[in-house]
């Protein structure tokens, strides 16, 4: 976003309005700024500065108040140019490390359990909505496939991806099949598909197994179901969200319609995934090998999220990339959100790589 150059006074006043509003959730007036902050400016001078900020769209006046509140533009200027992010609080660092450090005895369970726990910790520490998107699997490398025989004509296909994620699908067969034939098919599939990405498997499996299909009905069934078996989109069914109560308790969302909008949005897993995935990169903070992204209000481009801010960062599991983030009101402690999200992303990357 392009801005005119704000003067030092304007930057100071805008920063104070945002920081004060984050804490109080009430509009901020010039008298409050003059009384509580040592700017060396009179009440009248501060009023003039606020008038200029309002004229340029950085703050606005709610019709019921004499004070001012930040606009989306004001928040964006703040996170891009004024925000000062320091290191994570030591107590919060210890809380995350205790669960996700590769040296921690608590780091156990499946990757799904690790991601679910990450969402809970994020929601708890930030007092917002913690969100974790599992890694995209299209570029994930297939490791091995196993088949569990559930009945004479029913099997469960278990696909392991880089030892990090497991996908299971139950298939019904048209005829009975022996355990020996199942083992033969499993061996061929693992030999020919191991090391390929899911996308490569979907597009080439027919050619790679063309000499096998005529000899084995199960192989034909596997090839025919490849788009489902090796489809990465179903990973969004395992979106991890925690802390709904933190959002609905915020003063911004006390109106019944706003509560309904928030609940509707939270129940839409694909909608949340799009919002977190499309958050706008912020040049204000560059983490360890990751850039924290922040989308504010109307930047989210959906009516149910115009009152929300999304702070997110990528994490890595081998060659796969997922997203971890926080969703909350625009009246958010941005420095704190960025610190927590960035640190959690780093810990998840280390934890999932350590699980390899």
Curated annotation (Swiss-Prot):
The keyword Repressor applies. One of its GO terms (molecular function) is DNA binding. Pfam families: HrcA. The keyword Translocase does not apply. One of its GO terms (biological process) is negative regulation of DNA-templated transcription. Keywords: Repressor, Stress response, Transcription, Transcription regulation. Transmembrane segments: none annotated. It comes from the Bacteria. Belongs to the HrcA family. Negative regulator of class I heat shock genes (grpE-dnaK-dnaJ and groELS operons). Prevents heat-shock induction of these operons. This is Heat-inducible transcription repressor HrcA. It comes from Chlorobaculum parvum (strain DSM 263 / NCIMB 8327). The gene is hrcA.
